[in-house]
């Protein structure tokens, strides 16, 4: 009778612990040289130019991670190279992508939005570093046979493992260029992660190939990575130029939003932290507005490119950045005519050519920071009160600043997941089961159907037997994760302690 109260106490403690996570407390930003943005409290963050050896390319595809307790910077990634906390290339941290992606002169791998992401690998000082890139074979083909309209698909998703216990805390790459997904065309942008319902594991999402609605997801655990699981959505099927665009989860982990640079729309859907699946998708039209530039040349009259997306800390609003305009969308407003508000119209500088608003990111101080496509200055504009509807959101022009003579420029915030999202309350059941089924069930198998693995919940240490439809025993195991990639498609029966469930391999 005391199990449920004790479980709730444990879950509460876990959630409180994760809510105090400081892994995103400092940011690395800047092109040509790097700077650390140090968030202290609710006052303006401090900017310190510390990385003095170019080229660093902390422009669009970069990421970093800090100590969960102190907020001290541990290491950073620019999409191609890992740097330790001193700005020196980490031991075995160079050449994390194939040679052509590394050396491409105009757009190396470091310049693609959300092309790298860092996640903790448990609590032992190890970390996963995920990078989306392109093989030399694919590069050579598309460079001589371009798709047109700036499209250049990637076909390789890699991960590396960093051990921060090595080299006196400066870290070392102990597993390098491990293949997670290959021989599949992928968008070169949009990769993000959200904590699993259990507060320990992560769901990693990566958008699939051009012209499809495929979303690849992986369950990232301390001991292994499961997947890929593939979900086909009703929309969007992006097939145009994809240098810019972003994917973002809401702070409570229940929503996902995406934008694509040449599509005048916002994709919005519910997200299930148990299954990693998206549901109830919808498309919100974003106006093709004027740039707001006085006496503009013809190519600068209309604003038709979207760069970034971000949720407000209270989950109620989605912010969308175009090159010259920033919009606030209230997703739960029943009157659609009142749901969209333009927070900013026109550039944040009188100097032209203005370098355009780009990706957005929540800061640890509750503000939203607005990146620049190819910044020429050491400033970044900020939304000071993103939880407030309309004009009260408070666009603050170039309020993140570095006023010294350092030769560098601010571009975009790093690609970070929400480390502050904790475990959710209740038991994590598959999305397909109704609440009544959940209450009566003693154990469950998910995902079902599956093409890779079945995960058995609430039967730890028990023998699991898999039978074909002829009743022949195929194998037995006590593991909770059952690998079925070697089996043919079709229906099977999973037996655990005299109870049988039907499972489908697809």
Regions found by a protein language model. Give the residues of each.
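Terminal low-complexity, poorly structured segments
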Residues: 3-10, 417, 462, 483
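Intrinsically disordered, low-complexity regions enriched in polar/acidic and amide residues
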Residues: 15, 19, 343, 456-459, ...
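C-terminal outer-membrane/trafficking sorting elements
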Residues: 437-446, 450-506
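Generic marker of residues within folded, mature protein domains
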Residues: 6-9, 17, 54, 149, ...
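Bacterial Sec-dependent N-terminal signal peptides
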Residues: 1-25, 255, 290-292, 304-307, ...
């Amino acid at each position: 009778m005391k199990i449920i109260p004790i479980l709730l106490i444990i879950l509460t403690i876990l959630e409180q612990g994760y809510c105090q996570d400081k892994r995103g407390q400092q940011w690395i930003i800047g092109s040509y040289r790097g700077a650390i943005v140090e968030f202290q409290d609710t006052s303006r963050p401090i900017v310190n130019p510390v990385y003095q050896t170019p080229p660093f390319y902390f422009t669009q595809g970069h990421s970093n991670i800090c100590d969960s307790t102190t907020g001290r910077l541990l290491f950073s990634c620019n999409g191609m190279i890992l740097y330790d906390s001193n700005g020196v290339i980490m031991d075995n941290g160079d050449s994390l992508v194939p040679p052509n992606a590394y050396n491409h002169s105009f757009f190396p791998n470091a310049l693609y939005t959300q092309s790298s992401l860092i996640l903790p690998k448990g609590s032992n000082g190890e970390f996963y570093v995920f990078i989306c890139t392109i093989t030399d074979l694919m590069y050579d083909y598309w460079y001589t046979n371009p798709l047109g309209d700036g499209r250049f698909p990637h076909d390789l998703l890699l991960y590396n493992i960093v051990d921060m216990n090595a080299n006196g805390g400066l870290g070392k790459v102990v597993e390098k260029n491990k293949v997670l997904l290959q021989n599949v065309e992928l968008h070169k942008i949009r990769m993000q992660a959200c904590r699993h319902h259990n507060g320990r594991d992560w769901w990693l999402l990566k958008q699939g190939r051009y012209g499809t609605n495929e979303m690849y997801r992986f369950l990232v655990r301390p001991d292994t990575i499961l997947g890929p699981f593939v979900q086909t959505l009703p929309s969007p099927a992006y097939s145009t130029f994809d240098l810019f665009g972003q994917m973002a989860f809401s702070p409570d982990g229940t929503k996902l939003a995406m934008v694509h640079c040449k599509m005048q729309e916002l994709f919005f859907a519910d997200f299930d932290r148990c299954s990693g699946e998206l549901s109830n998708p919808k498309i919100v039209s974003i106006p093709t507005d004027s740039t707001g530039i006085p006496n503009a040349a013809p190519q600068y009259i209309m604003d038709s490119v979207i760069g970034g997306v971000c949720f407000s800390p209270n989950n109620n609003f989605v912010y969308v950045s175009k090159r010259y305009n920033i919009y606030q969308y209230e997703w739960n407003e029943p009157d659609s005519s009142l749901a969209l508000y333009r927070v900013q119209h026109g550039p944040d500088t009188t100097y032209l050519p203005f370098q355009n608003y780009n990706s957005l990111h929540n800061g640890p101080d509750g503000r939203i920071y607005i990146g620049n496509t190819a910044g020429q200055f050491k400033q970044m504009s900020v939304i000071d009160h993103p939880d407030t509807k309309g004009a009260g959101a408070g666009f603050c022009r170039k309020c993140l600043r570095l006023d010294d003579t350092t030769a560098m420029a601010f571009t975009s915030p790093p690609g970070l997941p929400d480390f502050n999202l904790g475990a959710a309350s209740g038991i994590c059941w598959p999305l397909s089961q109704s609440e009544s089924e959940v209450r009566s069930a003693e154990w469950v198998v998910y995902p079902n159907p599956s093409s890779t693995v079945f995960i058995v919940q609430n039967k730890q240490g028990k023998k699991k037997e898999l039978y074909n439809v002829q009743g022949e025993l195929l194998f037995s195991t006590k593991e909770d994760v059952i690998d079925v990639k070697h089996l043919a498609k079709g229906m099977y029966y999973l037996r655990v302690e005299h109870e049988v469930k039907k499972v489908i391999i697809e």
